[in-house]
């Protein structure tokens, strides 16, 4: 169990003891364990975050502009303030390091700007921050690498925000008795407002630029740093807990992730620092660059983006390949797949039948979606050439296909909590052409 020695103090559930909050805040048992700290199931998912009980505040350091010779105003409009990291997202990971994604289609949004400008979230003294002020903060500190910042916000909420159990509309009806007449439509919008408000609040508390500067780690065209120097500086400002850093192919710092457990509902904003569950980082031990915003390579290009790759997908251990529907066969012709770098990280996978998805209910692989908007984002380990999903690179099937050309087996993603008992376990090897 995570932090078992600490979490013993939180074990047990005594529902008679309640917090007393003002209207609009959760009223939950005071002695619930931290998220991912329970030893028995907890049914009240308005008070206990599950399955995404590990909350990551992820931040970008985007330094390369789209074109040279931008002035400071133009540079900050594109990349954010020169003396600040920007927000990538607030992600709920499961307790073993995997992560759910695009959980509830009925909660998906296609707009943030209009929602935060609406009367429902302005001119209301009971709100911690007015919607238009929050929107201004997002425009300043939550930047997309493609220039369409709102598209990143929408993506982050649909992919991650809809997976937060304590932000579901049915929870709001419990915490807001005086506004219960507003109903599910209002609560759906309130969850969007709260997701971005809480993300921004946590980002402000974790000022990575200042944390590094306190330890004389500042952006430079020439100076380089060791991984231990950067991690030590962050740890000393993050309650002695480690952060996770990532670099691009030039070994330049690009991201910092902060892991947390959650005490109660996310609406309480009681985040407890946690050491990273993932250790894989592209940053080398030595020679890490921390370039100032506006820096460009001598050939005037920003960091390389991987081109679209084309190839087949082979099954490790048992032999065979994937066909265009995403099923496993042993005889015949393997399908061609495209591995496409997503706008916001990770990869899309596409056959001529359509984009591949992993259905959340059974984690079954299917490649027939016509739209890329909500296609699954896959992990790709370039060194090993294997495909993964939600932090796991293991796949499986209940049965193996026979040698006939019509025999096909359904493929499932495997995680510590799903499909771990499948008879056949393997990896999906992407063979580039």
Swiss-Prot record:
List the disulfide bonds in this chain. Answer: 28-47, 36-95, 46-171, 103-163, 247-283
EC main class here is lyase
CDD domains of this UniProt entry? RNase_T2_euk
Q: Is-annotated flag, keyword Protease? A: no
The record lists the catalysed reaction(s) as:
a ribonucleotidyl-ribonucleotide-RNA + H2O = a 3'-end 3'-phospho-ribonucleotide-RNA + a 5'-end dephospho-ribonucleoside-RNA + H(+)
Q: Kindly identify the residues recorded as the active site.
A: 88, 156, 160
Q: In Gene Ontology terms, what is a biological process of this protein?
A: mRNA catabolic process
Quote the cellular component terms of the Gene Ontology held in the record: cytosol; extracellular region; fungal-type vacuole; vacuolar lumen
UniProt KW Disulfide bond keyword: yes
Positions annotated as glycosylated: 38, 71, 221, 263
Subcellular localization, per the record? Vacuole lumen; Cytoplasm
Q: What is any Pfam family matched here? A: RNaseT2L_C
Supply the alphabetized keyword list.
Cytoplasm, Disulfide bond, Endonuclease, Glycoprotein, Hydrolase, Lyase, Nuclease, Signal, Vacuole
Superkingdom as given in the UniProt entry:
Eukaryota
Q: InterPro entries given for it? A: Ribonuclease_T2_eukaryotic (IPR033697), RNase_T2-like (IPR001568), RNase_T2-like_sf (IPR036430), RNase_T2_His_AS_1 (IPR018188), RNase_T2_His_AS_2 (IPR033130)
The record ties this protein, via Gene3D superfamilies, to: Ribonuclease T2-like
GO MF terms held by the record: ribonuclease T2 activity; RNA binding
What PANTHER family is this protein classified in?
A: RIBONUCLEASE T2 (PTHR11240:SF22)
Q: Which family does it belong to?
A: Belongs to the RNase T2 family.
Name the job this protein performs.
Rnase which modulates cell survival under stress conditions. Released from the vacuole to the cytoplasm during stress to promote tRNA and rRNA cleavage and to activate separately a downstream pathway that promotes cell death. Involved in cell size, vacuolar morphology and growth at high temperatures and high salt concentration.
Identification of the protein by name? Ribonuclease T2-like
Give the taxonomic lineage as stored in the record.
Answer: Eukaryota, Fungi, Dikarya, Ascomycota, Saccharomycotina
């Amino acid at each position: 169990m995570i932090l078992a020695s600490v979490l013993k103090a939180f074990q047990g559930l005594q529902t008679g003891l309640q917090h007393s909050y003002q209207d609009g805040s959760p009223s939950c048992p005071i002695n619930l364990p931290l998220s991912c700290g329970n030893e028995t199931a907890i049914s009240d998912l308005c008070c206990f975050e599950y399955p995404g009980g590990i909350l990551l505040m992820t931040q970008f350091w985007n330094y390369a502009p789209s074109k040279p010779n931008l002035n400071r105003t133009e540079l900050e409009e594109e990349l954010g303030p020169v003396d600040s990291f920007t927000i990538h997202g607030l992600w709920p990971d499961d307790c073993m390091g995997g992560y759910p994604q695009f959980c509830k289609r009925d909660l998906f949004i296609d707009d943030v700007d209009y929602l935060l400008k609406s009367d429902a979230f302005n001119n209301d003294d009971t709100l911690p921050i007015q919607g238009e002020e929050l929107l201004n903060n997002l425009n300043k500190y939550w930047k997309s690498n493609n220039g369409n910042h709102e598209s990143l916000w929408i993506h982050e909420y649909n992919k991650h925000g809809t997976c937060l159990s304590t932000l579901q509309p049915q929870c709001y009806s419990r915490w807001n008795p005086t506004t219960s007449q507003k109903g599910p439509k209002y609560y759906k919008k309130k969850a969007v407002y709260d997701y971005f408000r809480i993300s921004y609040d946590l980002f402000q508390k974790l000022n990575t630029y200042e944390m590094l500067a306190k330890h004389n780690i500042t952006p430079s065209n020439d100076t380089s740093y060791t991984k231990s120097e950067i991690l030590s500086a962050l740890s000393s400002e993050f309650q002695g807990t480690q952060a996770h850093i990532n670099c691009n192919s030039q070994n330049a710092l690009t991201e910092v992730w902060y892991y947390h457990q959650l005490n109660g509902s996310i609406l309480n904003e009681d985040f407890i620092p946690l050491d990273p569950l993932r250790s894989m980082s592209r940053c080398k031990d030595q020679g890490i660059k921390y370039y100032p915003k506006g820096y460009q390579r001598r050939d005037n290009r920003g960091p390389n983006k991987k081109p679209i790759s084309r190839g087949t997908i082979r099954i490790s251990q048992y032999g065979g390949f994937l066909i265009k529907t995403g099923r496993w066969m042993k005889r015949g012709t393997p399908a061609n797949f495209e591995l496409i770098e997503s706008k916001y990280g990770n990869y899309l996978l596409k056959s001529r039948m359509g984009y591949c998805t992993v259905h959340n209910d059974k984690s079954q692989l299917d490649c027939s979606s016509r739209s890329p908007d909500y296609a699954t984002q896959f992990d790709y380990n370039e060194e090993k050439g294997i495909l993964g999903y939600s932090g796991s690179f293991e796949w499986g099937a209940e049965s193996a296909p026979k040698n006939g050309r019509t025999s096909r087996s359904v493929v499932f993603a495997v995680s510590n909590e799903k499909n771990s008992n499948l008879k056949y376990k393997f990896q999906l090897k992407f063979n580039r052409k």
